[in-house]
Amino acid sequence: MLKASVFLLLTTCAVFLTGCTDPNRDAVKIGMNIELTGEIPAVGASSKNAAELFFNSLNEQGGVILAEGPKKVALVIRDNGGKADQAASVAQQLISSQDVVAMIGPNSSACAIPAGQIAESLKCVMISPWSTNPKTTLDQDSNQPRRYVFRGCFTDPFQATVLAKFALNDLGAKKAAVLYDVSSEAPLGQATLFRDTFTAQGGEIVAFETFTTGDKDFSAQLTNIREADPDIIFLPTYYNDVPLIAQQARRLGITAKFVGSDAWSSPEIIKLGGADVDGSYFCNHFSTQIATDEAKKFIADYTAKYGQPPDDVAALTFDSCGLITEALKAGGKNECEALREALSKIREYKGVTGTFRFEPGSGDPIKSAVILQIKDGAFQWVTNAQP
């Protein structure tokens, strides 16, 4: 009877342990630290969609080929709420508790900068698809490049140059006003860089106005801008704020063209802004209208799965997944250090957003940009800008 009881107990334990075995135990675990809620949830949704599309397809083909053989990839997705402190906490949890070999995201610079600090200190590869602020890949103390942090996009100094030249040369603007969120890392950096670049190239900044995240009344700032009579208004702010600013500006009789940064790239800006944002221009990473054959396949696959074409965040995330996969293959191991070393040796990568070129010791790709116009309820390609 005792033997039977012991046998039953051991059998029960074995079944229990088997049932609790982690199905991803032998997989390559990649974390996602993204903005699924908060101020910019469309950004997180696009990033999640693209990563799942990429790795589901890779897994269907057998997974990533390492030295020990093929391995499936398991995504560990976490929401950072679009907040810097949560992004840092998620980074800590993904790396320390989930043992991910790499982390995709955060996307917003405000979240990517502190998360990058955690990734660097814990020696885990992080790639931000969409963070353009230079601080993301720089050590805060030494101002030297972080060894474990990379990005999938161009940086703000390049973007500022592109926008300033476009405003001066293509739009014929001589006077510009700037309105930006002073409490958010990316808009703050973009506003300052645009001001400096625009004036250095012969333009005049006639108003430099600020607001704080969550503000809904921009009448005081816009009244000052109206009095300054600019040719253009530069709004380096996220897609969720632009429609309200544009609406209030038009009601005040302001007719100047709006020019924006890559933070405008979600189609939500068209849904929310309507006629008030029609005719506006912004800098971006990707256009479905000038796609390569590889990009056309991505656009078709993404649209078929999600019912809408990909935005730039989706395309940049897809390319970030591709960079990680290429580095995993080259490194041959399911290890952070092998991945980092292989990723740091990539000098050129052709993705759906174009060609990436990396200088030795830098996690910032040298890439081209596009200028898009919001016209007739859609994003229309205007021109390319080369680095």
Which positions does each model-derived feature cover?
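Extracytoplasmic ligand/sensor domains, especially the bilobed periplasmic-binding protein
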Residues: D99-A207, K257-Y281
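Extracytoplasmic "Venus flytrap"
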Residues: G31-E52, R78-A84, N107-A110, L179-L188, ...
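Short, polar/charged alpha-helical segment
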Residues: V43-L66, T192-T199
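Surface-exposed patches in mature extracellular/periplasmic domains of secreted proteins
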Residues: G63-E68, V73, G105, V178-D181, ...
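Extracellular/periplasmic periplasmic-binding protein-like sensory domains
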Residues: A246-F318, A378-Q386
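Beta-alpha junction/loop-to-helix N-cap segments that form part of ligand/metal-binding clefts
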Residues: T21-P23, A27, A42-S47, Q61-D139, ...
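Segments of small-molecule ligand-sensing domains
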Residues: A304-A314, T325-W381
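Short, low-complexity disordered leader/linker segments with a strong preference
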Residues: M1-K29, Q386-P387
